[in-house]
Amino acid sequence: MTNQEPQLLFFFDEDLPAKSRNVRFKYGPVEHLGPRVVGDTRQDHSAASMFCSKIFTLEDGTYRMYYWSYGSLCCEDPKESMPRGLVATSTDLLNWEKPDLGQVQLDGKDTNLLHIEGLELDIVVGCSQVRISENHWRYYFWGCERDTRLWALLAADSEDGLHFKMINDGRGLLYHPPLPECGPLLCDVAKKLKHDPEEYERDMTLRVNRLQSNDASTVYYHPDRGFEIFHQYLVENRPESGRVVDVPYNCPAFLRVMARRRSDDGIHWGLPELIIVPDEKDPWDQQFYGMPVCDYAGWRIGLLLHFRTEAGQQTCYVEQAFSRDGTNWSRPLRGHWFEGAHPEDAGGIYPAGDALIDDGDSWLIYYTGVCTSHDIVNETDWKQSACAVRVPKNRLLAVAADEVVGEFMTEPIFLSQDEIKIDATIRGWLRAELCDVFGNKLAGHHLMDFDQISGDDTDAVLTWKGSNTAEYRYKPVCIRFELLDAELYCVKY
């Protein structure tokens, strides 16, 4: 019989499983690892950000981190800062060095600053990288479009992931809305370029409106799907929406929602799909700021960055979001997963573009920790650090029961193994019953036949009077679970 990896059943849908009683969703645990890269040099002064950026495994087994800094003191005036992109390297995903790249010198010494050939203005914000093939890397970032100086998504290509050259003639791929609160007005740009303001504004307004995005965006490439970008999108926040905020913060007239665009070449992007919009289950002042995404076990897993805009609540955190197709997303728990645990991330958590990074039996989540809330920038104390948490693999979201016995039934599944295993933390007890697809008990696999289990186990085997489920291999079944004081994360079948 062909050996194959077990299938994984997660509980990532919007609603609890069928026939649920006395159970609830519960986030999995995280271990805080603290700051891993800090802005302690002139080139990343006070700000080492991984927001939207990524880590890549290289052919020699080492790791390359792309990050960026708002505080880079790389101008002629040593007190003037300019956002720039940088590189760090590691052998273990946790301890990082800042290598001399030989591209940009400060005070006569090499640095880990990246130089992008052909970039008109050396400004790099919100960089997001993809590796298209072994010798084809692409570096997306936000900066000033050539000539117009509009705030735009730009791109550069490289053969080795270190030496990049601008593509598309420095023209923007997507644009930040040209609003007084968000960037330069098109007509003002036209006047500076000595174009006819009315003609220029019409042509460019249509282009910018069609390609509207936000600089909180992450780009991905997959050989089968092509290019995707998940980005924040601003929609007009009308008074009748009930979501207008009457306190100062940036862009009060707009509501931030999440959008996705697709492209065959990563340069020419289609129209956006609005994929996550605040609804009746969300707080009245909910906004979404970004969403890194990764693939796992047939799911698209998103770390949805959200914050509330009412005064005193603008601390950015992440919640979990899940999708099968990238368009329709479930959000089982409407609230943040974890908070900062250090002074460096007390003001908010902005996840890196990888979402979940495989590290054996666990995942790492890298993020930018900030010490102030979204609406406050204290230039004296303002810092950004690349921080990390560790998450046990498969333990993202559980169906949990507390001090009253809970139960639920799984969807029909085809068993691909002789044994059914579960990943669970059981302080009380758990038992299970095997059923047909209509929910009828299967002989010899009743609740009272089950060998009750407890403890913390990632591979606890389900047995009934010592017998497994080999006779039902490649047949459809459902499983009814009863549990007390326990969290069930995953079924392996």
Predicted regions and their residues:
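Beta-rich carbohydrate-recognition and catalytic domains
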Residues: 1-286, 295-347, 367-493
